[in-house]
Design a protein with these regions (language model features):
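Histidine-/acidic-rich catalytic cores in large beta-rich domains
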Residues: 18-183
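Sec-dependent N-terminal signal peptides
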Residues: 3-14
Length: 183
């Protein structure tokens, strides 16, 4: 008898913990819509340190169908459904790929010293990864008079974060790299 109550208590505790997602209001303007909404709220700046980022999928009327919380102070993003049916998100300098049961199948990140940029990742029809990255470069911006809201010239040794687009094959070998600093 005691074992039955212990099992019931454990099951109830787990289900209560699973409902630990933040409260929100969903206003539905057109109930004829179908589909799902992928949400990734983030906080920027010092106040973000006490915020637990999360992924959430809502159905067309605002019911939670998926929720995953991440470590406080570390942002996640770009949570989406790809055209091949996989879901992807960025976290800790990688993109993770999940199937429809939310099982992580693989991860991919930029190579050749390129820094991870979590703004976009796509997979082509033939399985190649298109990744967005960045690199820090020093540039002479002294001929540009756009700075400090008063037309001041830029620095001759300005530190600039430049975009890099990287394409990797199915084995994650870099097959193409485009550097915005070159254009």
């Amino acid at each position: 008898m005691m074992l039955k109550y212990l099992v019931l208590f454990i099951v109830l505790s787990i289900s209560v913990h699973a409902q630990n997602y933040p409260q929100f209001n969903a206003t539905v303007y057109d109930s004829s819509g179908t589909g799902y909404y992928f949400l990734v709220p983030i906080k920027m700046g010092p106040q973000g340190a006490n915020f637990n980022p999360y992924h959430m999928i809502l159905d067309s009327v605002g019911n939670v169908v998926y929720y995953k919380e991440f470590v406080s102070g570390l942002n996640t993003g770009d949570f989406k459904l790809l055209s091949n049916g996989l879901m992807t998100y960025t976290y800790l300098n990688k993109y993770y790929l999940m199937d429809s049961s939310f099982t992580i199948l693989d991860s991919v990140n930029c190579k050749n010293g390129i820094q991870h940029d979590g703004h976009d990742m796509q997979i082509t029809a033939n399985g190649e990864y298109l990744l967005m990255g960045s690199e820090n470069v020093v540039m002479d911006l002294s001929s540009y008079y756009l700075f400090n809201n008063n037309g001041s010239p830029g620095s001759s040794t300005a530190s600039v974060k430049a975009v890099v687009v990287q394409i990797q094959d199915v084995n994650k070998n870099v097959i193409f790299e485009w550097h915005s600093k070159d254009y």
